Amino acid sequence: MTLLRRAITVPLFTVLMIGLLAVWPLLLVIGGVAGLIGRSSLPVRTLGVVMAYALLELRALWQLLSGGQNCDQFMRDLLERGYTVGRRTLNIGVLLDGASPTPEQIPREEPMIVLSRHCGPGDTLLVAWLLGIHYRLQLRIVLKALLRCEPVLDLAGDLGCLCFLRHRHKHARKQIHDLAASLGSGQALLLFPEGGNFTWRRWRTAVIRLRSSGRLREARRAWRQSHTLPPRTGGTAAALSGAPSASVLVLTHTGFSPDGRARAWWRLPMNRRLLIRTVLVPAAQLPPPDQLSPWLQQTWSIVDAWVADHADAESVVQ
């Protein structure tokens, strides 16, 4: 199945990226005219992002197919280049809350489990940049299996940088457990306890699911917390059981939408900073396994409240 998928996606993406670069001058003219008519730089900037993505995709594919890549060096290179593209084309970046720990305060002797909010396409790149470049952690990221259709992510999974969850429940938890157990000092596992990107549809579905299963208290809590999805304990529990000595870094961010919630994938952010807050929870302060679920629920209540308080914060750059 893997070979068949790659036999389709790698040539397809390669031809598509080369085709985009070939018609770049024509697209630039069209984008420039559209920008003049609409008095907006968005068309040209959007084309800039598309062209930069094509170049990054081709370069990364060439590196991966050539072999001999180091997982951590490849990730650092990809994150640095992706962040540079976002900063130069869209003028977006990261603004770290002053209460967050500094890189020097992050423990290096033991592995780290990062529990991050998930809201908006592209936000994950900036979150990963903060962890991998600013905090200098060697990242391992848990993703949905659907993302293996993107050939760079698919091939990077062979390096051990990424873990694609093939199944739900027990099989997925075992994957997370095994990955966490393999972590060494200075390495971090990035998890998204909400299980997916925040959307209004997923939020409503989650509330209805909790109500229909008789978990009325959790349903009321989820209804009040309208900036986040209810966190799922399974992945976090699996990670902590695999790495019992790991500390936890809780990562919250405002997203790029003015209300801190969902943003349509085609609406590129411009001239904005992603406000991020991180909270370090040492391993000694983590609850026992039987208390993990209420701890995570309470933690996510704090996450939701922080987003609600800071969503309208001044993050627009003129």
Name every feature range the model reports, one short phrase each.
Residues 1-112, 126:
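Membrane-anchoring hydrophobic helices of lipid-metabolizing enzymes
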Residues 56-81, 108-169:
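Catalytic core of membrane glycerolipid acyltransferases/transacylases, capturing the structured
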Residues 97, 162-167, 280-282:
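Short acidic-hydrophobic, aromatic-tinged amphipathic segments that line or gate anion-handling sites
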Residues 124, 176, 232-236:
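Conserved glycosyltransferase catalytic-site signature
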Residues 133, 137, 145-160, 184-290:
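A cross-family acyltransferase "interaction/gating" segment
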Residues 170-181:
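A Trp-anchored, charged/polar loop motif used as the substrate-binding/catalytic surface
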Residues 287-318:
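Accessory terminal regions of nucleic-acid processing enzymes
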